[in-house]
Amino acid sequence: MFRESALSVFGVVLMYLIYNKTLSILAALFLFAVLFTILYYDRMYQSWINAKEQEAFEKRMGEVVKEINAGESTAIETIPRIIIQVWVQKDGGKPRVPANQLEYMKKMRQMNPAFEHIFFNGEDIEQFFKTNYLEYYKTYKDLPFFIQKLDFFRYVAIYHYGGFYFDMDVEPLKPLDESILNHSAVFPIDEYANSIDCQNPRMNSYCLVGQNFLLGQYAFGAVAKHPFMKVLVDTIHQNSLKYINIAKQINPSNKNDIHYFVYKTTGPDFVTDCYVKYKEKNQLYILSNGKRQVFGDYAAHKYIGLWK
């Protein structure tokens, strides 16, 4: 901050001298070049410092996650070899999955041939609820935003079948092996929150309770009927009417408000809120390799965000 202020003062003085013809044009150009060079290298230095600070922060967070996972209880059963993926057209038409995401799905199947792969479209989801969870069907239909419906379904599907859910824009990097199966529930890191991030209203409440990361739900896994999955499902189910009423007050053209609302009601913030309140945290394994938007070393979330 001091350097930026000093450089700003230098620039103002320089402009003053030029305006009053105290400096020659040649001298002014030289000083401008000096100022530009200082600014350039100052920003490069700041970027380097920020990168180092972020690297150190993520390393610390990695140690925090290791400590959390050290308390994990032994899984009574392993996560079943099931992979669930979903594609629903907003316009209600037949699935038109983008080519790159079809490749991710194909790669997922090739890397995990021993897994049962279940793909749901809009009609499949409707039938699933009508057949298995009629009490949740109304919630699914009533949730005000398209992505909320899909969020709700992914939680119910994993609660029902067990296995792993992956967004279509998640690129597999290596096969799911025994080490990932030997947990009762697995969630990745969505976002880390350093000291600067903690000033953001979205992250501040988590930082205040020492929760410096958000859990992701672009990919996760669990055994069937896992109690944490039940918490996610029932919390949305029980609050659906409140969500509907809040949504009515949101300006449809205000995308930022819609995104924030979704994050908090069915998205990563919602999952993190449930995790913070969940007493049996030792039932969950936090999958982290120090990076955001990854499923450990197994997959990377490309964050295409077509729902936005």
Please identify what each model-predicted range represents.
Residues 2-150, 166-308:
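Glycosyltransferase-associated regions of secretory-pathway enzymes
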